[in-house]
Every structure is written in C-alpha cells, then in structure tokens.
A protein has these predicted regions:
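C-terminal alpha-helical "lid/dimerization" subdomain adjacent to the S-adenosyl-L-methionine
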Residues: 144-190
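Conserved class I S-adenosyl-L-methionine
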Residues: 1-43, 46-54
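Conserved Class I S-adenosyl-L-methionine
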Residues: 180-212
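A conserved beta-strand element that flanks and buttresses the S-adenosyl-L-methionine
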Residues: 111
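Class I SAM-dependent methyltransferase SAM/SAH-binding core
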Residues: 55-100
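Short catalytic micro-motifs in class I SAM-dependent methyltransferases
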Residues: 114-115
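A short glycine-rich, Lys/Arg-flanked "PGG" loop and its adjoining helix->strand segment in the class I
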Residues: 125-137
Length: 219
C-alpha cells in the first residue's frame, strides 16, 4: 500500500465525517447501547489513549469508565464533531496521525475501534511496536473491529487484496485500506510479535480483542 492510498484514506474520513454516524451505524441509538455494553465489558480504566476516535461515539463511553482519555484522529472534521459530542472534563482531543504522534506519557489502556483493519499490512508490525512503546508496564490494548466474514460487503480493487473502493453519499470515490480481522490469524501473528492476545466475536459482524505484551517474546 502506497503513502498515496493512506493519504486518500484520511481524506475519505475527512469528507465522510458529517455522514459517518448514519452510514456506519444506521440506528445510532442502538449503536450507542451496543458500544456502552462493550466498553463496560472491556473495563478500560486509568489513562486511556483512543486511536482514530472518529466522531466520538466510543469516546463518549470510554469517558464513563476511564480516569483520563486522550483521543486522537487524523481527520479534523471528525474531531470537531467528537469535541462537540463529548464535553467530559476527563477527555482531551488531538488532531494527529498515530504514526507520527508523540505522547508525553504512557497509557494504561490503548483502545481503537474499526481502526486495525485500516492499518496496511506493511505497517502492521511497526504499529504494534508503537503500541508497545506507548503502554505502561502493565498496560493492555483493547480493540473492536469487523470480522473477516464481513469482507463480501466491500469492493476490492483488481489485484489489490487490501485496498477497497468506498463512495460517499455524493458519489465521490476513494481508495481505503481494509484488512478484515480473522481472530485465529490475528492471535497467531501477534503471538509471533510477542503479544498475548485473545480475540472473540461480538455478534455476527464484530470482533473484540485484548492484547498484552508477553512476559517473554516468542521466538
């Protein structure tokens, strides 16, 4: 995946921000209830970093359980919506690309929803090393994403097994990275990188995962 595609992906989410909730979730009230349930089950606490916070639906739930939430996203239009939605005193937002962002602290929990599947395969290992560097000593990574069974709903570009074409409501087309999550495969890959990871399903469409750095990297 080229840098051009990654830049186009950010541009897509900038342009989609105003219509994101409706097109991603449909019934936003039902989505909020599901999100609240999942976050309560995952129990994020302490200092939480949310990567790719989008319009703030997950941030809203994280704020209820975390001591402090730092929420970042590369799309300023999405962050503006999130700031308006979530005005909790324990939440701060930043417009930032996670791959170039530098934190002034380490985090007890790093959380992301519908983000891992947008990480290019060529950046997968670097991304998880970045997470390791951002975690406190006993920290954990929590994530939600789409199960590989949902792959059929996307239109993959010819010869590009991780690049799909997405359209906005106005018809504009964008290239976006999309690597759906196969739970067993993800557990295996992270194990090879020195993570203890458990990935399960939540309904037919989503996966939920928890990962911690293993005490000894596997060889």
């Amino acid at each position: 995946v080229t840098d051009e595609v990654v830049t186009e992906q950010v541009d897509y989410y900038r342009r989609r921000a105003a219509e994101y909730d409706e097109t991603a979730y449909g019934d936003v009230a039902a989505a909020r209830a599901r999100i609240a349930r999942l976050v309560a089950d995952l129990r994020p606490a302490g200092r939480v970093l949310e990567i790719a916070c989008g319009t703030g639906l997950w941030t809203e739930a994280l704020a209820a359980t975390a001591g402090q939430v730092t929420a970042i996203d590369a799309a300023p239009e999405a962050v503006a919506i999130a700031r308006d939605r979530v005005r909790a005193a324990n939440v701060s937002f930043e417009v930032a690309d996670v791959f170039s962002w530098r934190a002034g602290t380490r985090f007890d929990v790093i959380f992301f929803s519908a983000w891992l599947s947008h990480v290019p395969a060529g950046r997968f290992e670097a991304f998880w090393q970045l997470l390791r560097d951002l975690l406190a000593g006993d920290g954990r990574v929590l994530f939600i994403d789409e199960h590989v069974d949902e792959r059929g709903k996307e239109v993959y570009l010819a010869g590009r097994d991780e690049v799909v074409e997405r359209r906005l409501n106005d018809g504009r087309r964008f290239r976006v990275v999309k690597n759906f999550v196969d739970p067993a495969d993800l557990e295996r890959r992270l194990g090879q990188l020195g993570w203890d990871c458990v990935v399960g399903r939540d309904g037919p469409d989503w996966v939920r995962g928890e990962a911690r750095p293993a005490r000894q990297p596997r060889r």
